[in-house]
Amino acid sequence: MDDIRQTIRTRPREGTARATSAFTELAQQVRHQGLLRRRYGYYWTKLIAAPLVVAVCLATFVWIGESWWQLFTAAALAIVFTQIAFLGHDAAHRQIFVSGRWNDWISLVLGDLLVGMSYGWWQHKHTRHHANPNKLGSDPDIELPVIAVTAETAARHRGPVLTWMRGHQGVFFFPILLLEGLSLHASGVRRVFARGRLERRWIEIAFLSIRLGGFLTLVFLVLSPGIAFVFLAVQLGLFGFYMGIAFAPNHKGMPVVPRDMALDFLRRQVMMSRNVRGTRLLDVVMGGLNYQIEHHLFPSMPRPHLRRAAPMIAEYCRTHDVPYTSVGLLTSYAIVVRYINRVGLGERDVFTCPLIEQRSLIGS
């Protein structure tokens, strides 16, 4: 199993009560270092820049007019929208302001109005993921419609063609991400029109209508239908691909938690998450998601503090014998592909054994 992922695998020494107090101790250290303090200058700079950059891109789009050079504009917009989505992710986790109301409105403007993703849909889905990452029956992120990332999902449908595709699904994983952008928009639209409680429903409907309807109208006013469709394919494809490759290394290929297994908060968040090592440029490119362990332990920690927190939290986990996983970017993708292929081939409980061992030791 060690050839699949680089994990510091050790054993917990303490019981459940001690494990709970261990996180409290870590939280006190993090707070003492000032790593939960808001970074208003950092975030206000980004909040002001976001609409300005979008405006510049759209002005450039209109200025270029009918031309295949617009495909470069499409690529630029894909990058800009993804970076704004990362900023909306920060706001939704209360990283920007102390006020929950301010964070909510920033999330609505960034997510619904600028990117075209429903904040209500994201909040409903992402909150469940954070509560129980990689847990069967609880984490919606491991219930994908096309790719099977758990043995339970892979076993539901069988047949010669599907069996072959599942056995090679790691190869198809990245091309499928090209459809993720369209899926994110569609999921948001379905959510705002679905039954059930949704705060600020009409605001979301209005913002999504302006963003999606306005953007489509502008594209077809400036471009001929042929170029317009290719432009949208490039913009949506690259947007979805960028979003997908930023989120994929975080948990895929990490242990899948059985439905009946209970873990303390520290192990539940650390053992199911993977950090991606890299430079500050990688921090920008991945929107801070490369510090997934720190983010899961302290969701409201401002993005600029994650890099500072990582060495301290890694050392704390080593001291308390909690497996802390950190790999390079290319290694993380290789792990994801190999793991998805193994699941597709029908291997069961690929990473369950270490979890069962941990649970038995925690309870001892």
PLM regions: where:
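Short, charged cytosolic
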Residues: 2-29, 172-183
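Intrinsic disorder at enzyme termini
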Residues: 358-364
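Alpha-helical bilayer-embedded segments of polytopic membrane proteins, i.e.
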Residues: 38-84, 111-116, 167-184, 197-246
